[in-house]
């Protein structure tokens, strides 16, 4: 009878777990059936990716009115899990981005959006918003890489992040693919410095119209694997940040993760600075633009006892956005542009604008560089701000 009672209680617990969102998150066995179904659908999509890409190319051909004939190179660097609140470039007390600060100080055309958000908190979902058009401007699904391809751009994809979905849905549009990381998941220890010689090589070969996309592993958990182990902090580890974490009741584990995250940020500072410097070195005599953003942010202990991906706090969506160009035809009024907020799901419109690809649908109001830019805060961000409990940023 006792065993029967225990079995009955376990059955109730199992049923209860289906009902509770939090339990579904903590005990994924309860959602395996639905997950299997979703993966089956996605697998079928990937199996037919060539047909899907043909649809995207047909759509692009139908909507492009002017492809732009001027040779130029655009370098798009996409980071991972970078929260601008942990960048000294954006006012963080730890000196985590000294090289970017130096570039910002000395380069007139180097700009940062003071406010920037992703509208998704995970990589694939963020890519889907960054490189695809939302339904509003098009009656059918649009893909910015298809537009670039139809406009005559040579597309190079350099990746240090192994992701089947990203490869299937995005890298297949490229003319050249350089995959530097064959190990997926959080346990990969592939250093982002691998992309630097590949970027230099791609820039040396660039001719005509070229789009180079560099996908970094960035600050993807595990943070301790995102920087060389001999890298040392340039700040006192018992500084005001550490004290704030203690005062806010952060666990010892999260205090350690915070230190690892900031060290990973210091390493990323070097990588990003070098991608910029390499791009600039190869910009003589040709129009070149450099764009950086993170796919999404990460919660770093400011709002919750949490370090990492977060769908429920603003840190999960808070990102940096950086831009540089040597093009004289792009009007750069730093004070005005840097005040403009940026949203990741509007990236594709700005890329079209830089490339000079004109379309049957309007996009000027969503292009950060355009004089007709009109900011609308993402509803996801507005809702999170309403529920923000701790506004203190240290």
Predicted stretch roles:
Residues 91-95, 280, 284-327, 364, ...:
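Histidine-centered active-site microenvironments of extracellular/periplasmic hydrolases
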Residues 14-76, 81-244, 318, 343-375, ...:
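Active-site-proximal alpha/beta segments of enzymes that process anionic O-linked groups
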Residues 117, 157-159, 211-218, 262-268, ...:
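Short beta-strand segments
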Residues 197-200, 238-290, 342, 346-348:
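A long, amphipathic alpha-helix that forms part
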Residues 314, 388-394:
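C-terminal, low-complexity/hydrophilic appendages and adjacent surface loops
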Residues 325-330, 357:
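Short loop segments at secondary-structure junctions
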Residues 132-135, 185-186, 254-269, 276-280, ...:
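Active-site rim elements
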Residues 2-9:
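Membrane-interfacial entry segments at the cytosolic side of transmembrane helices
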């Amino acid at each position: 009878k006792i065993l029967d009672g225990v079995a009955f209680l376990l059955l109730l617990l199992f049923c209860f777990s289906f009902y509770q969102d939090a339990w579904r998150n903590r005990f994924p066995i309860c959602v395996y059936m639905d997950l299997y179904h979703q993966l089956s659908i996605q697998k079928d999509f990937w199996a037919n990716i060539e047909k899907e890409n043909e649809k995207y190319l047909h759509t692009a051909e139908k909507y492009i009115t002017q492809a732009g004939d001027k040779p130029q190179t655009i370098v798009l660097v996409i980071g991972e899990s970078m929260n601008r609140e942990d960048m000294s470039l954006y006012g963080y007390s730890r000196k985590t981005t000294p090289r970017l600060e130096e570039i910002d100080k000395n380069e007139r055309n180097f700009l940062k959006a003071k406010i920037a958000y992703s509208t998704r908190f995970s990589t694939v979902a963020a890519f889907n918003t960054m490189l695809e058009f939302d339904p509003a401007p098009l009656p059918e699904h649009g893909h910015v890489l298809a537009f670039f391809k139809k406009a005559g751009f040579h597309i190079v994809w350099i990746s240090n992040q192994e992701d089947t979905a990203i490869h299937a849905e995005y890298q297949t549009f490229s003319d050249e693919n350089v995959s530097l990381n064959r190990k997926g998941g959080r346990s990969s220890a592939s250093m982002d410095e691998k992309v630097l010689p590949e970027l230099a090589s791609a820039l040396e070969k660039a001719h005509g119209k070229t789009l180079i996309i560099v996908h970094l592993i960035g600050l993807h958990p595990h943070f301790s694997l995102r920087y060389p182990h001999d890298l040392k902090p340039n700040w006192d580890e018992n500084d005001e940040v550490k004290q704030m974490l203690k005062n806010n009741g952060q666990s010892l584990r999260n205090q350690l993760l915070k230190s690892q995250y900031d060290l990973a940020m210091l390493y990323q500072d070097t990588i990003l600075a070098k991608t910029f410097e390499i791009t600039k070195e190869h910009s003589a005599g040709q129009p070149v633009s450099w764009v950086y953003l993170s796919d999404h942010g990460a919660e770093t202990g400011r709002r919750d006892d949490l370090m990492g991906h977060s769908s429920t706090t603003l840190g999960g969506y808070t990102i940096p956005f950086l831009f540089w160009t040597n093009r004289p035809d792009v009007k750069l009024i730093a004070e005005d542009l840097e005040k403009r907020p940026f949203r990741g799901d509007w990236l594709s419109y700005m890329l079209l604008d830089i490339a000079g690809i004109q379309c049957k649908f309007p996009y000027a109001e969503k292009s950060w560089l355009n004089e007709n830019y009109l900011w609308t805060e993402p509803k996801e961000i507005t809702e999170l701000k309403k529920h923000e409990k701790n506004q203190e940023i240290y």
